[in-house]
C-alpha cells in the first residue's frame, strides 16, 4: 500500500520539527525523515567522548520565537531555557583563559 503525504520534511532538527508542526496544524499530512537515530539536530546534547557530554549548538533552541513556543505548547512538555552565566570558556597555553557570557565584566 502506497502512502501519500502532502509534505515530506527532510531532517528532524528543530527547524524541520517546527515546520512539520505548522504544516500539520494547517491540516496537511506530513512525513519527517531523519538519517540519525535521534531528533533535534543542532539542539541535542550528545556524548562526544566517554563521560563527556556537550551541546555544541543547543543555543539555537533559545532562538525560537516566543510565538512558536506558545503555539507548540512547549512549556507544558517541559521546555525551559536555562541562562548560563558563562557560555564559553577558552583555556590559553600560558595558563590564562577567556570567559564569555552575559553579565561578565
Language model feature labels by segment:
Residues 3-105:
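N-terminal glycine-rich phosphate/pyrophosphate-binding loop and immediately adjacent elements
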Amino acid at each position: 500500500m502506497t502512502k501519500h503525504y502532502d509534505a515530506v520534511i527532510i531532517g528532524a532538527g528543530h527547524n524541520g520539527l517546527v515546520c512539520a508542526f505548522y504544516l500539520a496544524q494547517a491540516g496537511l499530512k506530513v512525513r519527517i525523515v531523519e538519517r540519525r537515530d535521534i531528533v533535534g539536530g543542532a539542539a541535542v546534547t550528545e556524548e562526544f567522548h566517554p563521560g563527556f557530554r556537550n551541546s555544541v549548538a543547543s543555543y539555537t533552541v533559545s532562538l525560537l520565537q516566543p510565538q512558536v513556543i506558545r503555539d507548540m505548547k512547549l512549556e507544558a512538555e517541559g521546555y525551559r531555557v536555562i541562562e548560563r552565566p558563562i557560555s564559553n570558556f577558552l583555556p590559553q597555553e600560558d595558563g590564562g583563559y577567556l570567559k564569555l557570557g552575559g553579565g561578565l565584566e
